[in-house]
Amino acid sequence: MFKILKNSWALFTGYFVLMIAHGFQGNLLGVRSVIEEFNFMATGALMSGYFVGYFAGASTVPKLIGKVGHIRVFAAFASMASLSILIHAVFVNPIAWTFARVLTGFSLVSIFIVMESWLNDRATNRTRGQLLSIYMFITLIGVAFGTLLLNFSSPEKYEPFILVSLLLSSALIPILLTKRKAPKFRKLGFIDIKGLYRTSPLATLSMFCTGLIHSALFSL
């Protein structure tokens, strides 16, 4: 376990900081939407924008990783996430916020793909479970810490948005300075939804229902 952490500390440190920012901004936007008196339809639309970007990023980013590599993709989309949160502070209206949430979703799913593919490349059959369990533990702890930051901020002001941007930008530092080589990209293999359903109907339906529940809870 300690050897795994030693070999992946830069990756996990940057990801932990990023998850703090992620947890903070998700709750911040919900509270600020109430303060700005956005109607329920507008709030639902802007929070759903995250998952629109998430879906779009999941289908396009693997090709981009193949062209420019894991580290550049992580850096580029952490920067985009840092930029998109500032849109919320500058343009306080549902349309601008929806656009910003699409950018955020696209950026974060890109980072998730980089993380998970990088970890799977480093893992063996013996260590894969340990690596992925650490990854999920850091994800949840980071989001929890980010949520707590809401208690020490004033959501009606612009400073919390700047703090999120600072966290997202600082997440780049350990990744860009790591001595570890990024994984070599392998040829992509694709499976469509029909193929996935034929392979495992129950798992496909379960993932769909889990996604519905997760997106609803995350957007509250």
PLM features: residue spans?
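Helix-breaking motifs and short loop linkers at transmembrane-helix boundaries and internal kinks
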Residues: 69, 90-92, 96
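Structural signature of the two symmetry-related core transmembrane helices
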Residues: 72-86, 165
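Symmetry-related core transmembrane helices of the 12-TM Major Facilitator Superfamily/SLC fold
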Residues: 160-176
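Helix-to-loop junctions at the C-terminal end of transmembrane segments
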Residues: 57-70, 154
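Helix-loop boundary and gating motifs at the non-cytosolic
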Residues: 2-51, 207, 214-220
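Residue-level signature of mid-helix packing/kink "hotspots" within the transmembrane helices
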Residues: 50-59, 143-144
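Paired small-residue
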Residues: 95-103
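Cytoplasmic helix-loop-helix junction between adjacent transmembrane helices
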Residues: 102-137
